[in-house]
Amino acid sequence: MDKKHILCFLVLLPLNMALISAESEEGVNQTDLGVTRNKIMTAQYECYQKIMQDPIQQAEGLYCNRTWDGWLCWNDVAAGTESMQYCPDYFQDFDPSEKVTKICDQDGHWFRHPDSNRTWTNYTLCNNSTHEKVKTALNLFYLTIIGHGLSIASLIISLIIFFYFKSLSCQRITLHKNLFFSFICNSIVTIIHLTAVANNQALVATNPVSCKVSQFIHLYLMGCNYFWMLCEGVYLHTLIVVAVFAEKQHLMWYYFLGWGFPLLPACIHAIARSLYYNDNCWISSDTHLLYIIHGPICAALLVNLFFLLNIVRVLITKLKVTHQVESNLYMKAVRATLILVPLLGIEFVLFPWRPEGKVAEEVYDYVMHILMHFQGLLVATIFCFFNGEVQAILRRNWNQYKIQFGNGFSHSDALRSASYTVSTISDMQGYSHDCPTEHLNGKSIQDIENVALKSENMYDLVM
């Protein structure tokens, strides 16, 4: 293509792109084909500008001239060499991490395919493993939806239990309720965001305000999850380490930390994104502005890690004071740690880096998706379904139901069931000490002894 044709193209292409933009502003829906065409035309325009502006090759010897092959722009290349660059992102089945190659023959001409006798660029690697990657991506997508769906169902059941049984009401249960509610909201918004926004390429390309608001809410609620986790850690640390005999804690500060503080990084990110990287519905991760969101979350995780280690240290010390068998003491400390690990989000500390290799990357993706998107189910299981007092209350109400409607149980069977329930409640003192006695102020020696043993019994929830 000579300079005259290039100049003509440079004049006509902006007019064509302006017409496409005008159609978008008038409300004409852009299809995937229209988005792809716009990307290719933009790349072609930039390529021809580069061809015109770059200085002429002054090196001696034969070389292939700079050119546009229809999808990518190629610089001058010395004869007998192979040029290489990454695959374009025009098509959904193209992998931008793969490479495109173009060969310059020994005579200084671009390689021609023997079948068509036309210049040819090797794009075969761009979609070589597309089928497998699409299959993996779909599996991860369905895994994400299933994880959030199970999380929503389990968290709603947990909230019904906590609200229905008034005997479970206490400050820590209140924190649990807020934590559960933040996970429910985040799961709902995540499902909507993935199905309605992230999968709609035309919507993402038009970059409307509605999808930016959706991304803002998604990032805010994600922050709420981690900061309500931090609230749980702060509460436990205050209760067990800082002030065992403290009066009732003020929950207002926990509400501010859990619901209020995440608004700050979310708003700062929204302002910065609108000013410096206002594209693709703010979904693109190719920007350092995401550190505005991830920085406070990482800080919350590190603080919670400190709380975890300090709580375990105090628990081991207190368990030694009780003069129990050493193996039993450390077993309870390990179990307490296992309860706190998912609460504090240690999975991001254990898996901070993405490994190299096809199999390793796939395993990493599955593990991270399970850890991230099944968190709600995990939290509901640990703090509700494995809660000893919740199990005792449900068992007691079930036994009362069977006695009331007389499902063939004798009077002695009913008495034995009631006796077993009472003994179970006496044994399961995890939340019994956590709720009614958490506000003691050293009124009696027996009360003080009970509170001293509270940290040991608090984690007898999974026995």
Swiss-Prot record:
Residues 164-174, 238-251, 314-328, 387-463 are cytoplasmic. The modification Phosphoserine is found at residues 419, 444. Residues 23-138, 198-208, 273-288, 351-365 are extracellular. GO terms for biological process: adenylate cyclase-activating G protein-coupled receptor signaling pathway; adrenomedullin receptor signaling pathway; angiogenesis; calcitonin gene-related peptide receptor signaling pathway; calcium ion transport; cell population proliferation; cell surface receptor signaling pathway; cellular response to sucrose stimulus. The record marks 287 as: Required for RAMP2 interaction. The keyword Disulfide bond applies. PROSITE patterns: G_PROTEIN_RECEP_F2_1 (PS00649), G_PROTEIN_RECEP_F2_2 (PS00650), G_PROTEIN_RECEP_F2_3 (PS50227), G_PROTEIN_RECEP_F2_4 (PS50261). It is found in: Cell membrane. SMART domains: HormR. The record marks 285, 294, 353 as: Required for ADM2 interaction. The record marks 249 as: Required for RAMP3 interaction. InterPro entries: GPCR_2, GPCR_2-like_7TM, GPCR_2_calcitonin_rcpt_fam, GPCR_2_CGRP1_rcpt, GPCR_2_extracell_dom_sf, GPCR_2_extracellular_dom, GPCR_2_secretin-like, GPCR_2_secretin-like_CS. Its main location: membrane. Disulfide bonds join 47-73, 64-104, 87-126. Residues 1-22 form the signal peptide. Residues 287-288 are annotated as: Required for RAMP3 interaction. Belongs to the G-protein coupled receptor 2 family. G protein-coupled receptor which specificity is determined by its interaction with receptor-activity-modifying proteins (RAMPs). Together with RAMP1, form the receptor complex for calcitonin-gene-related peptides CALCA/CGRP1 and CALCB/CGRP2. Together with RAMP2 or RAMP3, function as receptor complexes for adrenomedullin (ADM and ADM2). Ligand binding causes a conformation change that triggers signaling via guanine nucleotide-binding proteins (G proteins) and modulates the activity of downstream effectors. Activates cAMP-dependent pathway. This is Calcitonin gene-related peptide type 1 receptor. It comes from Mus musculus (Mouse). The lineage of its organism: Eukaryota, Metazoa, Chordata, Craniata, Vertebrata. The gene is Calcrl.
